[in-house]
């Protein structure tokens, strides 16, 4: 065992993780970074399936330092992660779920990226195995970016490389009062406080594995916990980012990813009491954070659902949710020579419903998908304006010249 500081501490919180834990730990053993540059802190969170025993067996034969902590079940991933972080000695910390696995070069590449660019957080490309994974942020490798000028706000899971000194300086820890979405809160705050974020898009660093037994911890929990998560993230964003365009761009995330699904196709299956309760939980969030600056950043279907939530129109929302459940496509209505596209979801231009046309109007990013759409941009307007100014200037010049003569 080396006495020098390891480059990276891999923190693994494990609960009923067998047999997935076997491949998880094997992926750490296979890292090209070398055993002298890594350590593992593994916390068995009250497992009964042999997880703790396998961790201890692995610790005895591993070529790098492995610390195993066994404790009673804490009820969620926050406690084990915080405990692992408190024992970490590495310059960097990587949070690895016991169900998942690393690409062989993941740690070496991510540490090199952070060292090269001096960034506090590194995102490594993620691929899903029997489950979906975030995609929109992997278009290009970015040495240095931030949460406002990239799509990283759509990946708020904890499976990233963090500079440990940075986490300690800001006392960043996972909120143990949240049963879901605790990683979103932690990661968003890290993004906002970080001196730069790197995106490693040209190598798959992390394999997000879907469990066949359906016991993946992040998929559990009632709808009330989703509202708790949305509320906490919205409050964090509001506390850390002044009102305006930048805050609106981040608020899209909790509205789109956490809140909108509560009022989607599955809303039609909720009983009357659950529907009423969801509206009650959403009301203070809609009143405080929902406005045009957020709404215009959403696609029409999502914007319409949330508009109806804000207006407390459960009757109309049921029709929209049923339409979503049918998987039908809303008809595009092109007006003003194709420069405006409206999507005819239920109650479009229904006078009795009274929903403004603007709610149904597609923003350019969505409208471009429809044949016949003609985008009016500053670029197309400027030449016309310039020609008009030039003609006016020419007439004035001609008059002055005529009078002088």
List each language-model region with its residue ranges:
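C-terminal subregions of glycosyltransferases and related glycan-biosynthesis enzymes
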Residues: 210-405
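Nucleotide-sugar donor-binding/catalytic module of glycosyltransferases
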Residues: 1-230, 353-355, 359-363, 405
């Amino acid at each position: 065992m080396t006495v020098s500081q390891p480059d990276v501490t891999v923190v693994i919180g494990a609960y009923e993780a067998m047999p997935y834990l076997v491949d998880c730990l094997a992926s750490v053993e296979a890292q090209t970074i070398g055993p002298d540059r890594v350590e593992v802190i593994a916390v068995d969170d009250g497992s009964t399936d042999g997880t703790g025993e396998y961790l201890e067996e692995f610790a005895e034969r591993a070529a790098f330092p492995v610390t195993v902590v066994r404790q009673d079940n804490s009820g969620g991933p926050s406690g084990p992660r915080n405990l692992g972080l408190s024992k970490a000695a590495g310059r960097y910390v990587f949070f690895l779920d016991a169900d998942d696995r690393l690409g062989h070069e993941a740690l070496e590449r991510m540490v090199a990226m952070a060292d090269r660019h001096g960034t506090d957080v590194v995102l490594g490309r993620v691929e899903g195995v029997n489950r979906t994974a975030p995609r929109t942020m992997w278009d290009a490798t970015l040495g240095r970016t931030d949460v406002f000028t990239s799509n990283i706000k759509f990946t708020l899971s904890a499976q990233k490389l963090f500079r440990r000194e940075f986490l300690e300086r800001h006392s960043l820890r996972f909120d143990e009062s949240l049963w879901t979405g605790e990683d979103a809160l932690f990661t968003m705050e890290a993004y906002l406080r970080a001196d730069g974020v790197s995106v490693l898009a040209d190598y798959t660093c992390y394999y997000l594995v879907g469990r066949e037994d359906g016991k993946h911890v992040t998929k559990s929990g009632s709808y009330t916990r989703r509202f708790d998560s949305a509320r906490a993230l919205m409050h964090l964003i509001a506390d850390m980012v002044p009102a305006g365009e930048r805050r609106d761009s981040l608020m899209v995330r909790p509205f789109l990813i956490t809140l909108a699904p509560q009022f989607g196709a599955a809303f039609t299956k909720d009983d009357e009491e659950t529907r009423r309760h969801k509206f009650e939980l959403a009301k203070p969030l809609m009143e405080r954070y929902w406005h045009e600056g957020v709404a215009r950043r959403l696609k029409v279907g999502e914007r319409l659902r949330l508009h109806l939530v804000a207006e407390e129109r459960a009757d109309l929302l049921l029709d929209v949710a049923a339409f979503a459940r049918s998987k039908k496509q809303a008809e595009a209505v092109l007006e003003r020579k194709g420069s405006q596209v409206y999507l005819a979801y239920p109650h479009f231009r229904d006078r009795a419903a009274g929903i403004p046309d603007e709610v149904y109007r597609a923003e350019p990013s969505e409208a471009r998908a429809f044949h016949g759409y003609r985008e009016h941009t500053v670029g197309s307007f400027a030449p016309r304006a310039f020609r008009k100014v030039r003609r006016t200037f020419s007439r004035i010049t001609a008059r002055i010249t005529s009078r002088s003569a």
